[in-house]
Amino acid sequence: MYRQSPFGDITPVVKNLLIINVIFFIASNVIPVLNEILAAYYPASPLFKPWQIISYMFMHGNIFHIFSNMLGLIFIGPILEQTFGQKRFFNYYFLTGIGALALQFAVQAYEVHQITGSFGIPADYQPKDMSESLTLQSIYGIGIVGASGSIFGLMMAIFLLYPNLEVYLYLTPIKIKYFVPLYLLLEVFQGLRPTPGDSVAHFAHIGGALFGFILIKLWGYKNSNNFY
């Protein structure tokens, strides 16, 4: 008897990314130390390891975090995998994830330099106040996790290539060409004006979209329908 795949029309690379993300999420909840080993830390932190540049993309903070990212991957990924082909889609996903982390690291480096006058913490450095101390503790001691940078890269690709596709925001249809810029503006605002307790790496989201834009232009893709 023929049994339909539970993944339906999900394309191969997207399917494998989903499986790997779920495996990592389960493993990190069963073995909590993986959260420290596989999250991405600021390069000057003693917790930083080279593999984190890739592994952080498969780590998620909670069920809502992984659910929202994987939902974006399911909705956008198959369209782009069919557009790019499997190999290029795979490369795009990881390159935008790395680009996202690069911008987040650059912002962290700027913040550290503003406080210490260096991109690290000098041996004789003494914080001027509690705010400086807490900022440095956050940068050095809290890892970055999630596929969001890559998902924002996918969003940028959809925006550039299929701007008239619609998504539903609170049951209201809105075209990609409006939704993505508004979402990115919100990320820029939240990144520049962070609120207390906000643990989201907004500049990683912006970095994923920015590197996605660069890749689409370098690869010579153009939108496949009228932008307006």
Predicted regions and their residues:
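A detector for small-residue-rich transmembrane helices and their helix-helix packing motifs
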Residues: 1-228
